[in-house]
Curated annotation (Swiss-Prot):
All copies of domain Rieske, residue ranges: 429-516
Keywords: 2Fe-2S, Iron, Iron-sulfur, Metal-binding, Oxidoreductase
Domain of life: Bacteria
Taxon lineage: Bacteria, Bacillati, Actinomycetota, Actinomycetes, Mycobacteriales
Cofactor binding: number and manner: Binds 1 [2Fe-2S] cluster per subunit.
InterPro entries: RibonucZ/Hydroxyglut_hydro, Rieske_2Fe-2S, Rieske_2Fe-2S_sf
More about this protein: Was identified as a high-confidence drug target.
Enzyme Commission number: 1.-.-.-
Pfam assignment, any one: Lactamase_B_3
Listed GO CC annotations: cytoplasm
GO molecular function: 2 iron, 2 sulfur cluster binding; metal ion binding; monooxygenase activity; oxidoreductase activity, acting on paired donors, with incorporation or reduction of molecular oxygen
Family matches, as PROSITE patterns: RIESKE
Residues holding [2Fe-2S] cluster: C469, H471, C489, H492
Official protein name in the record: Putative Rieske 2Fe-2S iron-sulfur protein Rv3818
Length: 516
């Protein structure tokens, strides 16, 4: 088996039985905020696109690159389709001309039979509202000699099926770096922002190392990030200095952490690097550049590399911005009322979970999303808000023009906004913004309405707690860490006060906990 990095979470997996192109992203995403790092625009995308199978893990725009898929990927390729609760991924791929779909069942091994041989594959589908745009997934591929687990940026909660269905995993590709807007966009004191950033930077790497320990693969490829920020107003987000609060550490930083914790087998790959495996044996690792130049991209030459990359991509960035809607136009109150109020009326669990009005400051306009009243309105004089966003009007007008069903997958991941809040993170609020269609909101609201099993118990540091995390049902025997009277689930970094089970991260999500 040959595994070639095509950038970010993208890989070409080549076997005697056929090739699988995974998450081929090259064009800037999220209002031209994110670019692949290192640069992958020089790869031969026409050749890469002549694949037998296509796997797109989910619809986030750093995985689903519609322009690249349309222009370069063989439309007769068989699409390996995750078992998602809504059909959006299949629908979007069909719009691009793909017509051959292999529908998988969540966490079930399937055999792909082709003219050149057979492959065993399994797609672990994640279906919680917090998983991607209503769906994220991870892919296992076995060719009879070698088994690869491409986890990209998915966060599976139960990996026992890997060993039961495939035995030993030979190579594991996974995310370890940041892919979020927190804490950078929030209005808070610099000292607090630095503390939260440093905490997040470390927790996301701790989570990745826990996954590595669980999977137990011989070889590990850190991937699926970080992105590169080339717009002048966003360049400070790159981890090209020595800021311990930067949430976007690169592969070299994580490989050092792996080694420091006794985890060997980490492989550094850049776009165009190819690793050849036979079972647990790494036959070769070839890079498009000498090894010392590859490492320098992440170390001594990183700032200069990003500066040169920004110069090369300046025309691309300008062309992207030219495609945005104009900032000026008709008042936005009525278009936003037309968009949001029907969704509010279908989502009692989510609106009640949000629990308060939210302010949208869009240029000169202030618009209130009054979730308790299921209404979009103007503010009341001297009204104060627990949560608010300041978003440039051209971004809002663009997503309205394009009928975007997901503001997380467009505006929020761009980091081109400001936010403020009183109290903790509100998961229901961001879920609302990613569910702006009837199908999505119906699924998400129903998901929150279901009762989750908390009957099984474990003991951690002298506390008896429910085994499954109240947030997304992670196994707390694997992801739970107790410090004093605080439990942290490292899957998403949520915390609970063990004295009374109160969630310290968001409303609701009560934990059952006691001293035995």
């Amino acid at each position: 088996m040959q595994v070639t990095s095509v950038g970010h979470a993208g890989f070409l997996i080549q076997t005697q039985a056929g090739s699988i192109l995974c998450d081929p992203w090259v064009n800037p995403a999220y209002f031209a905020s994110w670019f692949p790092f290192p640069d992958n625009s020089g790869l031969d995308w026409g050749a890469l696109g002549e694949c037998d199978y296509l796997y797109v893990s989910h619809l986030h725009k750093d995985h689903f690159d519609a322009e690249n898929l349309r222009a370069h990927v063989n439309k007769d390729a068989v699409v390996l389709l995750p078992d998602f609760p809504v059909p959006d991924l299949r629908n979007e791929l069909q719009k691009l001309g793909f017509h051959r779909f292999f529908e998988t069942t969540d966490s079930v091994k399937h055999r792909l039979r082709g003219p050149n041989g057979d492959l065993d594959v399994m797609i672990i589908a994640l279906r919680a509202p917090a998983d991607g745009p209503i769906g994220d997934s991870a892919l296992v591929v076995a060719d009879g000699e070698t088994t690869a687990f491409n986890m990209n940026d998915a966060r599976p909660v139960d990996l026992d099926v890997l060993a039961s269905e495939f035995g030993h995993i030979d190579v594991h590709m996974l995310q370890y770096s940041g892919a979020i807007w927190y804490p950078m966009v929030y209005d808070m004191p610099a000292r607090a922002k630095d503390a939260f950033g440093a905490q997040k930077r470390q927790r996301q790497m701790d989570r990745a190392r826990q996954y590595i320990a669980q999977v137990g693969a011989t070889w590990v490829v850190p991937s699926a990030g970080p992105p590169c920020f080339l717009a002048p107003e966003l360049r400070h987000l790159n981890d090209d200095g020595s800021d311990p609060a930067n949430i976007f550490p690169d592969q070299m930083v994580f490989l050092d952490q792996m080694r420091a914790h006794g985890q060997d087998g980490g492989l550094l790959m850049i776009p165009g690097s190819t690793a050849d495996f036979t079972g647990t044996t790494l036959n070769s690792l070839r890079h498009p550049l000498p090894a010392e130049q590859v490492e320098a991209i992440f170390t001594t030459d990183k700032a200069a590399y990003i500066a040169d990359y920004a110069d090369r991509m300046a025309p691309v960035l300008a062309a992207q911005k030219a495609g945005w809607a104009a900032a000026a136009g008709e008042p936005l109150l009525q278009p936003l009322r037309t968009l949001f109020e029907p969704i509010m009326l279908q989502s009692n669990e989510i609106c009640d979970g949000i629990g308060y009005p939210v302010e949208l400051a869009i240029g000169p306009e202030t618009i209130v999303l009054d979730f308790p009243k299921r209404a979009v309105r103007e503010p009341i004089p001297d009204e104060r808000f627990r949560y608010g966003f300041a978003i440039a009007p051209e971004l809002v007008r663009t997503v309205l023009r394009d009928n975007e069903p997901d503001w997380v997958n467009t505006i929020f991941l761009s980091t081109r906004f400001r936010a403020w809040r009183v109290g903790g993170y509100n998961e229901y609020l961001y879920t609302f913004f990613k569910c702006l269609t009837d199908e999505r909101i119906a699924y998400a609201d129903g998901w929150f309405a279901e009762a989750h099993d908390d009957s099984s118990s474990i003991t951690l540091n002298g506390w008896e707690i429910q085994r499954r995390c109240p947030h997304l049902k992670a196994d707390l025997s694997k992801f739970g860490v107790v410090e004093g009277n605080t439990l942290t689930c490292n899957l998403h970094g949520w915390q609970w006060r063990l004295d009374d089970g109160r969630c310290l991260t968001a409303r609701g999500h009560q934990l059952r906990s006691s001293r035995p």
